[in-house]
Amino acid sequence: MKPYTQTTGLVAPLDRANVDTDQIIPKQFLKSIKRTGFGPNLFDEWRYLDVGQPGQDNSKRPLNPDFVLNQPRYQGASVLLARENFGCGSSREHAPWALDEYGFRTVIAPSYADIFFNNSFKNGLLPIILPEAEVDELFRQVEANEGYQLSIDLAAQTVTRPDGKVLGFEVDPFRKHCLLNGLDDIGLTLQDADAIRAFEDGYRQQQPWLFR
């Protein structure tokens, strides 16, 4: 997992509440458990004018010109600004995978569905919670200023606007440690690899009959 320390990125505003995981990555694309290949199908039903299917050449599909991620001013965005209850619906790690592979490192919203919120941290995506009034103001500023960027400092737990105003956010210390150091569940386990091997060697000596 890529470490998350500091980043400055273009903001894309997704002005819709209660965006569920099937809208983030539709169910027909969930057949793979690899973490790659989902970016082109992020928000598939909104980005394209046809019905997407696995294995399609997305470069040949008709784009929906009204969808925010298809607008030229938001190309290359790495910060997604969203509304309340983002990531609701069924549990699927494919949702943060798709957001990450598209290029988003950060989502900012007033609230999230619990399972999506937890899955995001485990997959290198930082979901920031800000008060609704601050999110409303960010939407106004993003829409009024082309090329609007935010700077996020995870260690300091701050979001800095272009006008210099600093917004603080809360994050669980353990989740913060994992993101700063790029540690997913496998990475955390491998930190104790020596202790695990020592236990296995000792257990093999104590219970040799189990290994015959």
Swiss-Prot record:
EC number: 4.2.1.33
Disulphide-bonded residues: none
GO molecular function, one term: 3-isopropylmalate dehydratase activity
Statement: the UniProt record of this protein carries the keyword Amino-acid biosynthesis: yes
Record has Lyase as a keyword: yes
Reactions performed catalytically: (2R,3S)-3-isopropylmalate = (2S)-2-isopropylmalate
A single GO cellular-component term on record: 3-isopropylmalate dehydratase complex
Keywords recorded for this protein, A-Z: Amino-acid biosynthesis, Branched-chain amino acid biosynthesis, Leucine biosynthesis, Lyase
Pathway field: Amino-acid biosynthesis; L-leucine biosynthesis; L-leucine from 3-methyl-2-oxobutanoate: step 2/4
Domain of life: Bacteria
Entry's Gene Ontology BP terms: L-leucine biosynthetic process
Pfam families: Aconitase_C
Oligomeric form and interacting partners: Heterodimer of LeuC and LeuD.
Family statement drawn from the similarity comment of this UniProt entry: Belongs to the LeuD family. LeuD type 1 subfamily.
Stated role: Catalyzes the isomerization between 2-isopropylmalate and 3-isopropylmalate, via the formation of 2-isopropylmaleate.
Name the UniProt record assigns to this protein: 3-isopropylmalate dehydratase small subunit
Organism field: Pseudomonas aeruginosa (strain ATCC 15692 / DSM 22644 / CIP 104116 / JCM 14847 / LMG 12228 / 1C / PRS 101 / PAO1)
Source lineage: Bacteria, Pseudomonadati, Pseudomonadota, Gammaproteobacteria, Pseudomonadales
Originating gene: leuD
